[in-house]
């Protein structure tokens, strides 16, 4: 007889869906829905915007507190990895944005294409890249360094690339660079300076601070989408334009993922480093991009940040699925590597 109590029945569709959907992605989608139904307006919008600015500063303070000087210097030893990530972020993406110029007049408005170009020059993200790399069992220390280097470099490179590629729409000035440095670089340096005292606290409260990290991003997303609702950005875009924008964003993400994966494999990087390169080289930072857009575009930033907001949602959903698949394959890869080592030892 068959013991049905021990039989492993296949998951139902709701069960499969529950395992497939990352809780953070679900929270992001819920945040977008909340902003669509109950957008912050008036005094509430001002308060939420100020809270988002504080949250972004706190994020960079934590980045500075977490990254030790020794880790930063050791990270420089993996210069090939960081070079590939930097080339993807600040060379490949802008080229993809320029390649879409021929399609833009037929698919997008001028402001949406400006936003697509801006998306392509925004630096990589720290929090999401590290979380995805950790899930996929990649090189987490390298991901921390790569994301941090990209964010710091982007404070200078992003405004320069935006001014070069976009032109007169960008308000590029010394005051703008100072504003970006004040909101992003200053908290990071403060975190570095106070790391001696803050690092032990951070080490003891990793789970709570991880929730704070993600909560900060959710607050930034809510603020951005609320602004889009109150300013009528969504009403200015036809469904056809929105679908076209999603299609172009998906194409850019797909090409970035494919190119970074292919390049990392061809250059002979280890599996752990390939994971880091793919996620750090294909992700874009909403926490860094939003304040930069506010400085570089002023009151006209509304439609410009829409491609970045959509890309951010898309990258998290797609990369969460990829990270989950790679996580399940990691034991197989480790086993195969162990077998190769044993064979080499026997032959030796």
Q: Which stretches of residues belong to each language-model region?
A:
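Membrane-interface helix-loop-helix junctions at boundaries between adjacent transmembrane segments
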Residues: 101-156, 162-176
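C-terminal transmembrane helix pair
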Residues: 286-338, 343-348
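Generic hydrophobic alpha-helical scaffold/packing signal
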Residues: 226, 251, 264, 278, ...
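Structural signature of multi-pass alpha-helical membrane transport proteins
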Residues: 2-104, 163, 167-271, 338-348
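The feature identifies polytopic integral membrane transport proteins across all domains of life
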Residues: 79-87, 107-121, 138-148, 176, ...
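Kinked, hydrophobic transmembrane alpha-helices enriched for aromatic residues
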Residues: 29-30, 277, 291-293
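Membrane-embedded alpha-helical segments of transport systems
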Residues: 26, 88-96, 121-126, 142-163, ...
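Juxtamembrane helix-boundary/capping and inter-helix hinge elements in multi-pass membrane proteins
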Residues: 69-70, 76-81, 105-109, 133-142, ...
């Amino acid at each position: 007889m068959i013991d049905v109590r021990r039989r492993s029945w296949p998951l139902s569709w709701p069960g499969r869906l529950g395992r497939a959907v990352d809780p953070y992605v679900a929270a992001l989608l819920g945040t977008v829905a909340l902003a669509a139904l109950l957008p912050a307006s008036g005094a509430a919008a001002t308060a939420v915007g100020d809270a988002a600015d504080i949250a972004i500063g706190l994020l960079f303070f934590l980045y500075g507190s977490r990254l030790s000087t020794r880790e930063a210097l050791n990270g420089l030893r993996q210069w090939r990895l960081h070079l590939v990530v930097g080339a993807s972020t600040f060379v490949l993406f802008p080229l993809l944005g320029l390649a879409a110029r021929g399609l833009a007049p037929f698919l997008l408005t001028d402001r949406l294409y400006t936003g697509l170009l801006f998306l392509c020059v925004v630096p990589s993200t720290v929090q999401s890249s590290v979380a995805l790399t950790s899930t996929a069992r990649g090189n987490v220390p390298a991901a921390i360094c790569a994301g941090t280097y990209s964010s710091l470099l982007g404070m200078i490179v992003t405004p320069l690339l935006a001014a070069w590629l976009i032109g007169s729409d960008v308000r590029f000035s010394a005051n703008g660079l100072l504003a970006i440095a004040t909101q992003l670089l200053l908290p990071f340096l403060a975190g570095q300076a106070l790391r001696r005292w803050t690092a032990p606290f951070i080490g003891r409260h990793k789970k709570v601070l991880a929730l704070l990290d993600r909560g900060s991003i959710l607050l930034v997303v809510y603020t951005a989408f609320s602004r889009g609702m109150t300013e009528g950005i969504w009403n200015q875009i036809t469904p056809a334009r929105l679908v076209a924008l999603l299609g172009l964003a998906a194409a850019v993400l797909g090409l970035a993922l494919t190119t970074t994966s292919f390049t990392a494999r061809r250059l002979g990087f280890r599996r752990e480093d390939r994971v880091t390169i793919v996620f750090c080289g294909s992700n874009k930072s909403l926490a860094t991009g939003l304040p930069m857009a506010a400085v570089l575009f002023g009151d006209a930033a509304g439609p410009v940040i829409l491609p970045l907001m959509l890309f951010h949602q898309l990258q998290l959903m797609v990369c969460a699925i990829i990270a989950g698949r790679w996580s399940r394959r990691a034991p197989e890869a480790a086993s195969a590597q162990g077998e190769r080592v044993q064979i080499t030892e026997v032959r030796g």
